[in-house]
């Protein structure tokens, strides 16, 4: 059963060169590169799948995680940036009124996950392969 729609795009490029082409020895090299983009275009309701949140307008490969703020130097506890959900269900930072920075907490259950701005899709994927033959 399909729950939604997504749009995928990208390109793939390959270039092969015959570097040495003699009767008894041949050497070929191939360079390959590709890109890939993904966007969810239709989905009835957003949902979380592991470290990803699937929602219209985002990629299904965007990381949706608890944001860390390092370690509390006084206690050694891990600190998390404090986020809350707005009325649209989006994670927004909670601003500390005294510092003007995003508030922190050492209790991961007090915060919400947020998009990190990172994706599990690399910007560019590539490879180099060589082929040698003798006689």
Predicted regions located by residue number:
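Residues on the lipid-exposed face of transmembrane beta-strands in outer-membrane beta-barrel proteins
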Residues: 13-17, 128-134
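Conserved small-residue
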Residues: 2-7, 11, 18-120
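Residue-level marker for the onset of beta-strands and adjacent loop->beta junctions
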Residues: 40, 126-128
């Amino acid at each position: 059963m399909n729950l939604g729609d997504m749009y995928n795009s990208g390109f793939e490029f390959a270039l092969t060169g015959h570097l040495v082409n003699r009767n008894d020895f041949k050497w070929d090299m191939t360079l390959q590169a590709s890109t890939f983009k993904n966007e969810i275009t239709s989905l009835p309701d957003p949902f979380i799948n592991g470290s990803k949140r699937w929602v219209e307008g985002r990629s299904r490969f965007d990381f949706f995680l608890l944001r860390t703020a390092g370690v509390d130097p006084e206690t050694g506890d891990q600190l998390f940036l404090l986020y809350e959900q707005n009325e649209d269900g989006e994670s927004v930072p909670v601003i500390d009124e005294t510092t003007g920075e995003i508030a922190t907490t050492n209790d991961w259950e007090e915060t919400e996950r947020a998009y990190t701005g990172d994706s599990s899709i690399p910007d560019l994927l590539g490879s180099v392969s060589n082929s040698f033959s003798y006689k």
